[in-house]
C-alpha cells in the first residue's frame, strides 16, 4: 500500500486532452478548448508541454512548478501574451518563434546558462523578462539582451553574474526602465554601483529595491561631472529647494491665519536661516552689480521686494515685504546655480501699499466718487528718480480683499461646443459681497490725494519706460543691457492701450470727455533721467578680468531679458483675463456701434499680445460673436420694456460702472494669474495642457431665456405631436428587429459550424425581446446521453451492480460552466474511510481499518465503523469546534500594547525577585566569610571586622518539589528531622539520654529560628543551598571532632557523628546481624510505649481517623504474635533451605495455574467497603525510610524489626510520589531528631559513602535472590483453614507433584507449538538459551501484574538501607490452641491497607525473615481473583521451589489467554491472539 502511494505521489504525469479538460472543469473554465484564454497547469507534475493544439486562443499559460525540461508544443499558441515557466528544469530558451505577441516571460528558478532566442526578431513585443535564480555568469551569457529593443523590465536577481562589462550591455538597452540585479556578485564589484547604472541607463526609473528619483539622477550626473564635491553641491541645492518650498507653504499658512487676526496679534513669517543661501545670494548680487547696478533693482521689482518709500506713510515694512525678502535670496541662488530658463511665475507682481483696510476702502470709494463727478481725467507728469511700479500693501487684510476681488469669473474662448457654459458661482459670491461692502462704505469716507499721487507716479513711470524703445545706438554692453527692457516696455505700452480701451468702455455713457491714451504718451521725446546717468562712453582699455566680468554680466543680462520676456507673456494673459472679467461685470453698452468698434480694437490688441496661439484667437472670436448675438437679443427685449425698467437699468449701469472702477483698481494692484487646479504651479503658461487652459478661464453665468435656447438648440421632435413620436418608435423597433435578425442568423451559422466538431451547450441571452435557435438541441442531447451511458458502463464494471436512478443537472452554457452538478452515485469507499487520518490518532486509524477489513471479510458481523471516538479525539474535536465559534473573538480582546505591558510587568517583578534573592544570598555570604571557632565547646561564628560571637543559624527546613494534597493534620506536623537513621550501632552509654537531648535541642533550635528576622528565614531556599554548599564543606573540613573536649553541650553532636561512622562501618562490612544491648532494648521499649500512648490520644472527631486508629492498635497487638512465630521460623529456615530448580519459559501475562482458596464472606464484604486503590507499588524508598523510623520491639528479640503505616486516599494515587513529600502516616510516632545541622552538611556526609552503600545494597540483593532460589524439601504441610491469613496471603512452599508437573509441561508444549506464529525464530532461540533465573527482571517487566519478587527487588534497588519486615510463613506448624484463637481477628486484619500479601525471604545469616509489600489494593470486586492470580503466576514461573500445595482436591478449568503482538517501536498493536488452555489446580 505504501509503495503504491509513493509511486502516485512522486510519479510524473503527461498532458492529455482528457486531463486538460478535467483541469478546466476543476478551474471552472470552458470545456471547449478554443474558448479559453487562460489555462492553469501548475503543480501538476508535467514533464513536457503537449496536447495544446486545440487551445489556440490562449493568452496566458501557467506552467510553473512542474518538471518541464524543454520549451516545446507552443506552435499553435500565436496569441499567447504571458508565459510562466518558473520552477522547472529548463536549460535552454528555444521554440518561442510562434508566440509573436508574447509580452511577459517568466523563467526564474530554472537551469538556464545563456539568454538567447528572445530578440526583437523572435519576440518583437517582449516587455518583461524574469530570469532570476538561474546560472547566468558573465556578459557573454547576457549579450543577446542587446537585441531586445522593446524590453523595459529585466529581473536578473540571484544569479552568478560577476562581470562588470554587463554595464555596457545595459547601456545599449534604450528602453530599459526597471532593472533588478541584487543577489549577484557584480553588485559588490562595481564601484559606485547605483550611480554607474543610473548614468548608463538613461531611462531607468527603478533599480533593485527602490525607484530612481530625479534627485538621484541629478546627483549622479553632478558626480560624473565634478566628482564628490559636485555631488555634494547638487545635493545641497536640492535640500535648499525643499526647505524653501516648505518655508513658503508655512508662510502661506501664516498669512491666511493672520488675515483673520488683528494687527497686534499677527505672527511673523519665517525667514531663511541658511547661511549658504545668504552667501550665494550676496555673491550673485555683487557680480551683477559690478556691471549694471540696475539689475538688483530689477530683480527686486520682479520678486516683489521694494525699498522703503520716500513718503512717510510706509516707514514700517509689511508682512508681505518680509516674505519677499526672505524668498529673494533663495530665488537668486536657485536661478544662478541652475542656469536654466526661468520656470513659473512670480507669486506677487504688483501690490499697493496702504496703511490698513480702512484707509484702502476709503481711498477707493472717494476716488470712484471723484470719477463720477469729474468731467475729465487729467494725469500730470512728475519726475521719478527710479522705476517704481506700485507699492505693496502693509497689511494682509488688504491683500485678502484684493484676492477676493480678483477671483471673479473670467471668460476665455475655447473649443467646446457652442452650448457649453462653465459657471463659477462660488467665485462670484465673494466678489459680490466685496462690491456691496465697498458700496456701503462709499458714503463714509472722503477723497484721498495720496492714492491719486501714487497712480500718477505709476503712469509716469510706464510712459518713461515706453520711451526707452527709441534708443538706437551701437551694439555695446549698454545696448545689450537695455534690449530686454525695451521689449518689456513695448509690452507695457500695449497694456496701457488695453487699459485705455477698458476705460473708454467703462466711461462711455458719461458725457465727460477724456483722453487717457494721449496723456500716457505725450512726452515721447523726453529722455528719462533714469538712463542719463548710465550712458557714458568708456574709452579706456579693458583688462582681462574686466572683460571676463563683462561677459558674465552679458550672460546675466540675457538671462534677465529671457525672464522678462516670459513675464511679459504672463502679463498679456493676465490683461486678457482682466478684460474678460470687465466685460462680465459691465456687460455690453446700449450703443452697439461703439461696442462693435471697441470689440474690433480688442481683437487687434489680442493679435498683438498673443501671436503664438492662433487657435485661441479664433476661439475668442467665435465666442465673442456668440455673445454679441446674445446681447443683441437682450437689447431688443429691453427696447420693448417699460421706460421705468429702462431707467432702472440705467441706474444699474451706473452701479456696474462703480463696480468696474473698483475692480480695475484691485486688478491693477494684484495681477496674479488665476490658475485653479493642476500640479506644476511653476510651469509656464505656454506649456499648460489644453484641457487645463480651458478650465482656468471659466465662462460667465448667463441666464438665457427660452427664446435664446431655441436659437442654439433645436429639439428633435415636437413633444405635443404623438404621431411623430410614434413614427420614431416604430422606426427604431424596425431597426432593432433587423439587427436582431442579422445577429440571430450569424449565431445560427456559428453554432452549426461548432456543433460539427464539438459537443456544446449554448443558450443565447438577451435583455430585451429575444429569439433563440434550438435546431441542434437533438444532437446536443444525443451527445450528452452518450457521455452518460459511457460513464455508467464504466461505473457498472467497477461496482458490479447497476445504479437505480440518476439525476441530471441543469444543462448550462459554457458561460455558466457546464456540469455543475455531479451525479449521485453509490461510493465505493465507505464514508468513514474517505479521510481516515483527519483528526484521528494512529490507533484510531488502525482500528478503523481493521473494522473495515473485518466487515469486508465477514458481512454478517455488525458494522463497527461508526464507533465513538476516544476521549483524546473528542477533546481535539471540541477544541476545533471552539476555534470556529463566534465568541472566540472575545478571547483576543487584548491588544499588543496591553500584552506587552503585562509582559513588562512580569519581567520587572521577576527582576525584583531575583535582585532580592541575590541580596539575601550575598548578605548571608558575608556571614560565611567570617571564621568558625569553638568557644566553650560550642561552635560560634566570629565576625571578621568586629570580632563578635554569633550563634550558628538553624538548619534549613526541607523544601519539596511537590505538595501533598491530603488534608491530614499529621502531615503538617512533620519535619525532616523526625527520622531515625539507625541501622545498627555499637554499644554506647546513655542512649536514652542521648535521644532526649537531641529532641530538646531540635525544639530549642526551632524556637530560636522563629525569633530570627525575615532575612534569616528567606535565606533557606533551594538557591541558597546550592550556592553555599561549598562553604558548608569548608566549615566541616575545619571541624575536627577528635580534638573537641567532651562536655555536656558537645556530647550529643559527637555521639551522633560517631553513630553515623559506625553505621557506615557496619554497611561496608555487609553484616546484617545487628545485636542490641540492654540499654538499646530499653530505649526501643520506651519508644514503643510512647507510640502506644500517642495512638491512644484522640486527634480529631473524624470517623475515618478513628477507624484508622483502631486498626493501628490491632496491628500493634498482632505484630507481637508475629514476632514469636518469626523466631520459630528462623530455626526451621536453616534446615529446609535448598537451591531452586530451573525456571521454564513463560509468556508475560498468561494465566497457566490457578489455586482457588476459600475466603470468608466477611472479608469480601469488608473489602468492598475499602476505597479503590491502584495496582502500582508505592515508592518503596520513601516507604522504607518511613518504616525505619517507626521501629517497635516488644519481645526483646534484637533480630526482628517491624513497621506499620496506613495509606490515606490521595487524588494522585496513580502518580509516584516524591521521596521527600510522600508522608502519609496516620499516627504520631516519637522520633529522635539529629543535631541542628544544615542539610548541606548532611548531604556531604552522605555523599562520601554513597558508593559503598550502593555496593552493599547490591550484595544484599544478590544474597536475597540466592536465598529465594533455594529449595526446601522438608517443609511441613499446614491446613489453610486454620490460619487467619490463609485466604489472601498463602505462599506456595513446596514443589508440585509429579502429575501436576507433567500436566504443566503438556500445557506448555501446546503453547510452544504456536510460538512461531507471533515470535520470530531468533527471539525463540534466545529465550530457549536463557535461564529463567537470569532473565527474571526482564520477564517481570513484561508481566501485567507485578509479582511479589519484583516488589521486593525494587525495594532493595531503590533503598540505601535494608529494612526487614515480619511476615507469615505458611510452612510453620501452628498448634491447635494458638491458631483458632486468631480466627476472630482475621477479617479485620485482611481489610488493612498495605497488607495485601506476605512473602517469605530466607537469608543466609539472619535466618528466615520476610518482606511485606505495601502495594495498594485493587477494586473490591477483583480482590480475591487478584490475589489468586498473583499466587498462580508466581507458582507457574517456578520462581520458588517452596510451594505449598493443598492436596485436598484438584480442579481443572478452561482458561483463555489474550496475547498482543506489538510493532518494532512497541506502540502499535500488530496482531491479537487468543490462546485457550486447560489448567488443573489443587484445592
From Swiss-Prot:
Gene3D superfamilies: Ribonuclease Inhibitor. Disulfide bonds: none annotated. Residues 1183-1196 have a biased composition (Basic and acidic residues). Residues 249-282, 300-327, 945-986, 1167-1213 are annotated as: Disordered. Keywords: Cell projection, Cilium, Leucine-rich repeat, Repeat. It is found in: Cell projection, Cilium. GO terms for molecular function: dynein complex binding. It comes from the Eukaryota. SMART domains: LRR_SD22 (SM00365). Residues 311-327 have a biased composition (Polar residues). LRR repeats lie at residues 34-56, 57-78, 79-100, 101-122, 125-146, 150-171. Belongs to the DNAAF1 family. This is Dynein axonemal assembly factor 1 homolog. The lineage of its organism: Eukaryota, Metazoa, Ecdysozoa, Arthropoda, Hexapoda.
